[in-house]
């Protein structure tokens, strides 16, 4: 829908990417939101991930093949953070509501959405840090066997979506 509004027509790449963004974004919240929460998260995913693709490609000048970071990374973080605010009552705070949990020793603990947001954000940062370190190590280990990880200048000019996958991704103007 966002691509349609921006370009004046719907495109297959936009439909598929929006669908994947919605799925990537609802995944961290899937056991914690109801149908309305899923719709809110899916709509947010389409909007936020579309603009994340634009920022990665245009503002940062990064050709992210198939927009993986902008769709899966940004979508995953968005879904994880939104759980704190729209998770169903009794799980992670719900719609700004407090959640009362009783610990094994009988102590009652009340969590608010703000507190849960901090926990969710810490989880995102830990996952991002783990991903960065693991990716760095994997690249360092396999790079000598592949002769490096850079594509040729011709492939880079052509674009990674086209040269690596034979498809054109977003053309953002």
Predicted regions span which residues?
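Glycine- and aromatic-enriched membrane alpha-helices
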Residues: 1-173
